[in-house]
């Protein structure tokens, strides 16, 4: 089956069960295509409702790959967090229903391809097969402690050329994910920026012979490679939409402050803008 058709078909099946935007899922799918010839399985830390893990399982099946997926989640939400580095993330956030996830797995016919391990990472990882190895990992743990636990387990088991995708790597007000990555993998990371707050890297070497030439930009004292982000038209379109959205948000907020502070009346356009604030469009 054509890879684009595989993506569209399977994204449509899992879209109601993931908080990831379509562009973010596409980026992870591209990583799967890049590492599909490597040995090792796929693993997701922080599977939530199962959408991304099941998407990977569906794609593995359609592409005829000899791989499986392991999904780990506490199903109790986040563990204790550190507000100084984890920002808005708090204990208990992002809890999900284990039975609903298992039901979705059965409905999709993925029992043989996707293993769901319920529990805190420390407990679940201690029960993993000793010979486990991985070519693709999606870390959606959101916070410092969980991300560091996941990376410490993953690094010795990641095959050469394997890809690691970090969600919420650039989440506003939260630096826990990137700090954990730097502590485990080293400060001099080649971070490829993905859609939204996503970044990915190849800790043991980039296997892509046709990878684009780096396009470096700095943010917050760290360097990010934008080449992959700028290579796809849908990513550029998403960036343009986000820029317009946040410009409108900023204008509305300025008008709001004028309103409550008794300054000159806000623009008429701000009332229209308020109807759009908070709507997140999936692309």
Give, region by region, the residue ranges found by the protein language model.
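S-adenosylmethionine/decaboxylated-SAM
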Residues: 1-22, 29, 36-282
């Amino acid at each position: 089956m054509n890879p684009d058709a595989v993506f569209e078909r399977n994204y449509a099946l899992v879209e109601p069960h993931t908080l990831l935007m379509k562009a973010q899922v596409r980026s992870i799918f591209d990583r799967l295509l890049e590492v599909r010839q490597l040995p090792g399985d796929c693993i997701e830390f922080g599977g939530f409702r199962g959408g991304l893990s099941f998407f990977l399982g569906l794609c593995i099946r359609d592409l005829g790959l000899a791989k499986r997926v392991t999904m780990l989640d506490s199903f109790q939400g986040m563990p204790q967090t550190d507000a100084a580095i984890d920002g808005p993330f708090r204990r208990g956030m992002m809890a999900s229903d284990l039975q609903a996830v298992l039901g979705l797995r059965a409905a999709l016919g993925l029992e043989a391809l996707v293993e769901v391990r319920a529990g805190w990472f420390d407990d679940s990882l201690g029960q993993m097969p000793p010979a486990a190895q991985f070519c693709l990992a999606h870390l959606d743990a959101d916070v410092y402690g969980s991300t560091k636990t996941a990376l410490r387990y993953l690094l010795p088991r990641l095959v050469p050329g394997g890809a690691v995708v970090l969600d919420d790597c650039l989440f506003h007000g939260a630096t826990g994910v990137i700090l954990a990555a730097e502590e485990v993998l080293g400060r001099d990371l080649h971070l490829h920026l993905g859609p939204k707050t996503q970044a990915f890297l190849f800790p043991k070497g980039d296997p892509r012979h046709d990878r684009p030439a780096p396009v470096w930009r700095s943010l917050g004292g760290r360097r990010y490679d934008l080449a992959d982000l700028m290579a796809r038209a849908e990513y550029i379109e998403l960036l343009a939409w986000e820029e317009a959205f946040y410009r409108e948000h900023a204008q509305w907020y300025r008008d709001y402050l004028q309103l409550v502070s008794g300054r000159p009346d806000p623009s008429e356009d701000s009332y229209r803008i308020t109807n759009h604030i908070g709507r997140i469009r999936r692309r």
